[in-house]
Amino acid sequence: PERMPYQEWPATEFPNKKSCQTSHMPAVEEETRVAVTLGLPRENMGRHTFVGGNFFMLRVLNANRNDLGVAALPKEFEAAAARTIQHLREETAKVTIDQVVVAAGRLQADLTIENLSGHKFPTAYPSRRAWLHFTVKDRNGRPVFESGAMNANGSIQGNDNDANSNQFETHYNEITSPDQVQIYEDIMVGANNIPTTGLLTAVRYIKDNRLLPRGFDKRAVDQEIAVHGEAGTDTNFIGGEDKIRYSIAVGDSQGPFQVEAEVWFQPISYRWAVNLKSYKANEPERFKAYYVSMA
């Protein structure tokens, strides 16, 4: 998947196929300078404000600039991180609460999560993950239910893979318990069928339920960009969106209830960072220290 975003793009409904550069670095409409010294202004130059999703590493570099020999100014790094966060908020995914029904001591909430991009989201490198943070509070603001809370160390409450490296969190069509979390991610396994974060030891994907772009037919695409795991048979998981229901017991809690849903994103998930502990070389140990300091 880290090399498949462009292969995912032609499988969408977007009619104007173009290069990655054309999409992410659109041409400036007027002539522009390409260097501070010498040279004449040029036409059709691509914009160089290339926004991805890795706000975390931008801030790691900025916070450890002396150790890493970073030359760019602090305000420039922070501006890039802010643009990245804005991009993630506005142009990647959107969650909508379609309806909420309370009856017989249970609350049911139906959600739709849309992919706003032209490829799978999260995109490319498998350390990235997005998940749903869903909360219900009673009329006094007291918590009744929460799924997908993030711990201070960057792990997700209820995520089996964060708690145990040999397990992983499955894809859900309905969530009924706080220890169930809808995480959009790809999970690799080695020859022993145990989850791994090692690119050289992985042999296949046991889970890939990353949000599909619009028009993507999971039944017809090549194996290289296929859906893996429970999402493959989930009829609500289709090109452009996923629908999920939260069905929870509210007991004696009094409404009206406050129901909130958010899509959260990590460019480097907890398990990928923690697994570096097994490497005793200087570089991974430095990165572990950076990760902990930023978590």
Language-model features: where?
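Extracellular Ig-like/FN3 beta-sandwich strand-entry sites
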Residues: 254-256
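Primarily the internal scaffold of c-type cytochrome electron-transfer domains
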Residues: 1-228, 233-238, 244-251, 260-295
